[in-house]
């Protein structure tokens, strides 16, 4: 079993949905460590993988990293909980390639759904975040395969390196 820390590559296939509805800024919720941990905790992942998956996706959806790969559409709509709510729909890329410094990363398949609601003191819903990992797959790939993937679509590769031993992203120069 390889426990050597080295530069590796993780290929992530993402089939996910996320929408945020809120009435005012006080109702806005975000994808953060707590919501991601809750979402991934609802999956069938082995307990030993939960911490690694949570850390990876918390990093991936942190604001400084997410701006590299997520896009957001904004609209106004009503739903059963809120009238004329602002709606943000997060558009995930289908694939991501992440440069990674750490030990061998296990293959993972994550399927999970979670909804978070924020209420005002009267009990009315003023914010709602829906997260759905319809099917998210994580697989470590060789450097040769990573180069092939990058060459086929340069947009797959994030410009930031994920370092599992650190809590903050480190920007690397390509």
Swiss-Prot record:
UniProt-annotated location(s): Virion membrane; Host endomembrane system
Membrane-related topology note: Peripheral membrane protein
Alphabetic keyword roster: Apoptosis, Host membrane, Membrane, Viral envelope protein, Viral matrix protein, Virion
GO CC terms, sorted: host cell endomembrane system; membrane; viral envelope; virion membrane
MF GO annotations: structural constituent of virion
Main location, first listed in the record: virion
Self-association state and partner proteins as the record states: Homomultimer. Interacts with nucleoprotein and with the cytoplasmic domain of glycoprotein.
Function: Plays a major role in assembly and budding of virion. Completely covers the ribonucleoprotein coil and keep it in condensed bullet-shaped form. Inhibits viral transcription and stimulates replication.
Miscellaneous note of the record: Most abundant protein in the virion.
Name of this protein: Matrix protein
Organism: Northern cereal mosaic virus (NCMV)
Organism taxonomic ancestry: Viruses, Riboviria, Orthornavirae, Negarnaviricota, Haploviricotina
């Amino acid at each position: 079993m390889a426990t050597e820390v080295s530069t590796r590559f993780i290929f992530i296939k993402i089939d996910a949905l996320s929408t945020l509805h809120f009435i005012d800024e006080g109702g806005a919720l975000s994808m953060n460590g707590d919501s991601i941990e809750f979402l991934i905790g609802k999956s069938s992942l082995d307990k030993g993988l939960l911490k690694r998956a949570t850390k990876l996706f918390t990093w991936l959806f942190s604001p400084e990293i997410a701006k590299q790969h997520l896009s957001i559409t904004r609209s106004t709509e009503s739903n059963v909980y809120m009238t004329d709510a602002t709606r943000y729909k997060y558009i995930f890329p289908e694939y991501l390639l992440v440069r990674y410094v750490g030990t061998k990363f296990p293959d993972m398949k994550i399927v999970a759904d979670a909804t978070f609601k924020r209420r005002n003191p009267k009990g009315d819903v003023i914010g709602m975040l829906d997260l759905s990992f319809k099917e998210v797959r994580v697989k470590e790939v060789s450097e040769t395969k990573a180069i092939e993937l990058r060459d086929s679509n340069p947009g797959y590769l994030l410009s930031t390196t994920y370092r599992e031993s650190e809590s903050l992203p480190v920007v690397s120069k390509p």
